[in-house]
């Protein structure tokens, strides 16, 4: 079968006709096919099965394989390997440094790394079924004794009868009864019982707050004091977060010409005032105009 070579070109190389023609001059055009990687990636072109003895991945317009690595995914790589003959080679363009495709993908596809960036598709011949002819009698088994003869020469030992009483005695010896009263001595039995948690009489009833006795000894009073201290600390922390310092307060005098609030539109009316504006509810006024309140009526 004649050798056939496949050249895979990225789109950046095909956009430079002069450089592409210079690359094609290094190969025999009568035994070379050219295919675009972007057309394979988009599914616009397909490759024949087991048609090429060698596949060469060309470098892009920048003399690197970065564009080829982006286009050759696992699906496209398996399609390329399917068009390679058994014993064929796939590699990147000569005199170009870099990796044309992923090494792990090549190994997973069943290729063998032969060096210098070349990978070979193993030439595995098709498996053929080979019948096995087994004779009825083998020479090395001809002199072997039969089963009946071996049984006669080596008889089995006589059977031993085991009575039920013997079995019961063995079980009784294995499982001895233990007196539970002997597990604890007098000192352990007389030790006080320590209750964990509040005593039953100190437990609150449903819907009522827990209250400790005046002479509480079960630890409920101490537990309630710790809970109150935690609540008080949380309340003080929240109060400190809401407290404003002197530097946080800003006083704005609206009776002086040119003085405005933070939004700068307080004098235009409620539609232009923020939520915390002190002039909410007052009519619009001129900046610098004196505002007076007389009998809850606004006097401008």
Swiss-Prot record:
Recorded hits in InterPro entries, A to Z, give: Anamorsin, CIAPIN1, Dre2_N
**A single GO molecular function term of this UniProt record:** 4 iron, 4 sulfur cluster binding
Major place of residence: cytoplasm
Keyword Iron listed: yes
Map motif Cx2C motif 2 onto the chain. Answer: 274-277
Which family does the UniProt entry place this protein in?
A: Belongs to the anamorsin family.
* Protein name as it appears in the record: Fe-S cluster assembly protein dre2
Native organism = Aspergillus fumigatus (strain CBS 144.89 / FGSC A1163 / CEA10) (Neosartorya fumigata)
Q: What is the lineage of its organism?
A: Eukaryota, Fungi, Dikarya, Ascomycota, Pezizomycotina
Q: Which gene encodes it?
A: dre2
